[in-house]
């Protein structure tokens, strides 16, 4: 299956989430909608990526975010200077560094939590989709 991935998450404060992910992780707004059957939303991504985020807020029946310590979005950043810069940007944008529930992520990465408790891991390593035998 060849597909584009959308990661959709309810948030408490839509604009706060947008600013945090744009400033902290370098995303840009690629779409927005208001009062679509009671939902407001913003899509964030970057040109050329095969994924994007959608943050939503329901005006009628707000959904409280309910992430767990193992609900992770992991970004693999093999370049040390890009990794360090992104970690600094995440902190400056309001992400809070937390100890990872799974110690594996603390070996080569840092785990951050946004204002809704969603976790992002910045992993200082490369990733390959090749199948291991």
Regions of interest found by a model, annotated:
Residues 57-62, 125-127:
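Acetyl-CoA-dependent GNAT
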Residues 9-52:
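Core segments of cupin and vicinal oxygen chelate
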Residues 3-12, 32, 42-47, 63-133:
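Vicinal oxygen chelate
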Residues 42, 53-55, 110, 120:
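A broad, low-specificity signal marking well-ordered, structured residues that form hydrophobic/aromatic
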Residues 36, 79, 126:
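Flexible, active-site-proximal loop/turn residues at the rims of small-molecule/cofactor binding pockets
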Residues 49-53, 65, 116-120:
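Short, charged/polar, Gly/Pro-enriched secondary-structure boundary elements
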């Amino acid at each position: 299956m060849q597909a584009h991935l959308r990661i959709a998450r309810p948030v408490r404060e839509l604009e706060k989430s947008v600013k945090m992910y744009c400033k902290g992780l370098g995303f840009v707004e690629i779409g927005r909608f208001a009062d679509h059957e009671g939902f407001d939303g913003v899509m964030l991504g970057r040109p050329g990526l095969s994924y994007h985020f959608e943050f939503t807020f329901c005006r009628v029946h707000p959904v409280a975010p309910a992430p767990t310590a193992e609900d992770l979005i992991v970004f693999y950043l093999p370049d040390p200077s890009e990794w360090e810069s992104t970690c600094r940007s995440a902190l400056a944008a309001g992400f809070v560094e937390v100890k990872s529930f799974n110690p594996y992520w603390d070996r080569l990465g840092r785990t951050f939590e946004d204002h809704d408790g969603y976790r992002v891991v910045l992993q200082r390593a490369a990733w390959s989709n090749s199948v291991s035998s």
